[in-house]
């Protein structure tokens, strides 16, 4: 039986190179990417939700897209078609590469020592790394399409492609580098 996402993209040959994220990237094949918060009451329930659906949910964060899952689904479907045309690769593999390249490995937290806040570098959990990567990919796409004639489908496709190439022009990759640079200075 083929493992297809959106009824079109095969996920059986997808390779995840980052072993820390491999346990948290879920590519169960669903034709309809809508679990309806089924896993929200379970600890670490996010692990059971398909990564593509989590990307859809991150797209619905702004006031323009709130509650419009079908519109977000249409945008993602068209973005995947653009990615497939431009790269001649499976867009799910390109997305996984983008997630691996834009997931920060360490960040800064604030510790208080006698009333003084001191920044301290800490490792990031794999679940948070995945959330940060998906969020930054979506923020980069929506910010580039805001007050622009370029449709969000193209912006999302370009953001995914740039992040998969580890290009500094990608919002997600530049944000990751910024977070890691601040963490390196706080060691």
Curated annotation (Swiss-Prot):
Q: Which GO terms describe its biological process?
A: translation
Q: Which residues form the signal peptide?
A: none
GO cellular component terms? Answer: small ribosomal subunit
Q: Name one Pfam family in it.
A: Ribosomal_S7
Entry's InterPro entries?
Ribosomal_uS7, Ribosomal_uS7_arc, Ribosomal_uS7_CS, Ribosomal_uS7_dom, Ribosomal_uS7_dom_sf, Ribosomal_uS7_euk/arc
Q: Which UniProt keywords apply?
A: Ribonucleoprotein, Ribosomal protein, RNA-binding, rRNA-binding
Q: Which Gene3D superfamilies match?
A: Ribosomal protein S7 domain
Cysteine disulfide partners in this protein: none
The answer to whether keyword Transport applies is no
Q: Which CDD domains match?
A: uS7_Eukaryote (cd14867)
Extract the GO molecular function terms from the UniProt entry: rRNA binding; structural constituent of ribosome
Subunit info here reads:
Part of the 30S ribosomal subunit.
Family classification = Belongs to the universal ribosomal protein uS7 family.
> What is the stated purpose of this protein?
One of the primary rRNA binding proteins, it binds directly to 16S rRNA where it nucleates assembly of the head domain of the 30S subunit. Is located at the subunit interface close to the decoding center.
Q: What's the protein called, per UniProt?
A: Small ribosomal subunit protein uS7
């Amino acid at each position: 039986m083929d493992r297809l996402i959106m009824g079109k993209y095969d996920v059986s040959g997808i390779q995840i190179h980052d072993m820390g994220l491999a346990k948290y990237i879920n590519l169960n094949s669903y034709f309809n990417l809508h679990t309806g918060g089924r896993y929200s009451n379970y600890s670490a329930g996010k692990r059971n939700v398909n990564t593509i659906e989590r990307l859809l949910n991150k797209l619905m964060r702004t006031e323009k897209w709130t509650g419009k899952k079908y519109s977000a689904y249409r945008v993602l479907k068209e973005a995947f078609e653009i990615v497939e045309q431009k790269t001649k690769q499976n867009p799910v593999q390109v997305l996984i590469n983008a997630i691996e390249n834009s997931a920060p490995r360490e960040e800064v937290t604030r510790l208080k020592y006698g009333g003084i806040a001191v920044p301290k570098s800490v490792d990031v959990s794999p679940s948070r790394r995945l959330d940060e990567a998906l969020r930054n990919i979506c923020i980069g796409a929506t910010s580039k399409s805001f007050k622009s004639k370029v449709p969000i489908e193209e912006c999302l496709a370009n953001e995914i492609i740039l992040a998969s190439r580890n290009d500094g022009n990608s919002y997600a990759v530049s944000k990751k580098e910024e977070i890691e640079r601040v963490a390196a200075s706080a060691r």
